[in-house]
Amino acid sequence: MPDPLIINDKIGRFKKVISVSGDKSISIRWVLLSSLAKGVSNAKNLLLSEDVLAAIRAVNILGIKSKITKKEVKIYGKGIKGYNYKKNITIDARNSGTLGRLILGLLINTTYPIKIIGDNSLSKRDFRRVTQPLSKFGAQFKLNKSKSLPLTIFGSQKLKSVKYIEKKGSAQCKSLSLIHI
């Protein structure tokens, strides 16, 4: 197993053009990461599937503005601590397991409890593979009996540094570990 990549320094400014074909998983990750960036992120050729639109609605609920045109999508990120939302909000991941799981990494240090829901299909999927590692960082969750959606994340203002090894090779779990804030 290769040594882990450790990034000790924050990226001060990132201004590059990256060209990728429309892809659901990449598009969802772009929306979520753009919500964390400070300033405007632009994407052309973003796949505007129902899952990606659900991701855009999710960051809108968290206080991040967006603009969708025929040619591009803009996300107006406010930085890592830039989410501004009301108490008692619910984020609907619809049928997107990627959104339902990765959004938890963004909400790990949330101030107020946030409920995550999904459609019938997503509500049958086990979420422990992401709630367990995030719990080690200090987040708290209220899961239903089947350990699926709906769930509530309580987050933590006192996150812990942990050594976590992803044994199942899950791209979602790896992404989750990278984007938790």
Q: Which residues does each PLM region occupy?
A:
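Structural preference for solvent-exposed beta-strand-turn elements
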Residues: 1-179
